[in-house]
Amino acid sequence: MSKSLWSPSQDAISRSSVYKLMQTLKINDYQSLHTWSINNLEQFWSIAWDQSHILGEKGERSYIPADFMPEAKFFPDATLNVCENLLSNKYKDEIAITSILENGDKLKISWDELRKNVFTCANAMLNEGVKPGDRVVAWAPNNSQTVIYTLAALSIGAVTSTASPDFAPAAVLDRFTQIKPVLLLSSPSYQYNGKTIDCLKSLNEIVNGLPTLKKVILMDISLDKYENWDSWIDPFQDMSFEYKKFSFDHPGFILFSSGTTGKPKCIVHRAAGVLLKLRAEQLFSFDIDESDKVFFFTTCGWMMWNWLIFILGSSASIVLYDGSPTYPNLHRLLEIAEDENCTRLGLSAKYIDLLRKSEANYTDKFQFNNLKTIMSTGSVLSPDGFRFVYQNIKSDIQLASISGGTDICGCFIAAVPILPIFSGEIQGACLGMAMDVLDNDGNSLPADIKGELVCLKAFPSMPLGFWGDERNSNFKQSY
């Protein structure tokens, strides 16, 4: 076996949530713990609920298997509000969200400000007649308003979906026409690569293609046809708001496939399933807690955006950045992580490779005193990419190559805080995820043979189905 690039300290191991779980269960190593977790799904996900401090009525049953794996049920008797679970912590004046634009403009929002804004926005949505199950969409930048809007939709049981402003009108309409939204949030412009890009012409085209819209809300400015964000929410600033609870299978998100073989598939996710899956990842794969500040470079068109905002459920602070990752310089994302004293940084493998090809050494330029983890995803991180991070960015860091997808709004395989890092390797499968690599005939393959990465058992963030696929026929054909 090759020499490890990094190993956790004994102190870090003993403080980790996954080690504490091993101690509780009297299990000595991660592989045995993982095997236990996939052989005892009901008990594992019940523990994950408890240790994540999920607010709500858990109910008696944790798991009901099914012949067709995606039809298995988790917590069928549970009721909860996902937004409440993301915002209900003890913090008030501490910063919850830092939102940064490409030109350097920065907005910091405290936990109390975030709650107030979400409740105000939720009341504005209720005033528009938005009901549980209605679709509420955004074609918008990655900023605090988009997060507030999304959380408000979740708080009232609406189904939310987002698209990045770099999506052309045709791409947006291919997605949103299928789900018939009632509200749309957008921005008159966005910044990218040193330019301000006007969105109004494209917005008009999108709105004209969505006849079900009751209201279009525009960030920053007012136009005759569209209401300004501030004027929309201001009448509801002082209104009270009370969370309503929904079933575990209540839909919360619609994410979209790439659309390479036709119109993008509208993948419907149960909000509570995503909450539990991501809280389990945050707890056992990454050890994220209230001491963390997490920056993951993403747009609103990628599932990692949903992944990032659910970090709020760990009482951690998040950093949003809207703009080019390489403007005004190649190391812009590293600058943000340094300036914001981030503890966790999420990058694409492609971006790390761009840094590597520049042959720059960043160890003198950046100290990264608080940075504990760099996460890499989007594609395979090469062994050269691993070595570059340790030699040219920071040597004492957990480099977590992770893999998941839009289909599950989470990770299949990710970090393991108690194990060493080896070049070109992902540390292990997430707890509760029964992963294997199969050939075309469904046979399990040895570790050194390429095949299809497959999850063999049910987990909470499996999709509910495809929107509009009433008999689940297309869904069953796809999975």
How would you name each of these model-derived features?
Residues 1-109, 113-123, 207-212, 220-225, ...:
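N-lobe entry segment of adenylate-forming
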Residues 308, 314-316, 342-346, 356-421:
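Gly/Ser/Thr-rich phosphate-binding loop
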